Amino acid sequence: MIDIRYAKISDKEFWFSLDGHLPEDEYENITRLRRGYILLQDGQPEGLLRYNLFWDSIPFCTLLYISEACRGRGYGKRLMAHWEREMKARGSGILLTSTRA
């Protein structure tokens, strides 16, 4: 079963096992502002998404990462769709992303 929830302080070790870009002191902001999500497969964390606000108002996805063992199963697509629905429900009419291959 797949579940997606907000990141918590207790997810910090998992978070940094996948996210090598976020300064460690920023993690508390991600959790406090609810700008990070954890994807769980059968209760085990396997992916994450974080975002910031561009121009202080436009949601901008700054990282989407799925553990290597779970890639190719559509989990990234599900995580992105979850974020898009939530941002739309909050009134955002535009979202931004950036990719690196």
Q: Model features per residue range: what roles?
A:
Residues 70, 74-82:
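Conserved acetyl-CoA pyrophosphate-binding loop and the N-cap/start of the following alpha-helix
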Residues 2, 6-62, 67-68, 86:
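Acetyl-CoA-dependent GNAT
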Residues 87-100:
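Conserved GNAT acetyl-CoA-binding A-motif
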Residues 49, 72-74, 101:
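Short, structured secondary-structure boundary patches
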Residues 15, 45, 77, 92-93:
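Generic N-terminal initiation segments characterized by hydrophobic and/or small/turn-forming residues
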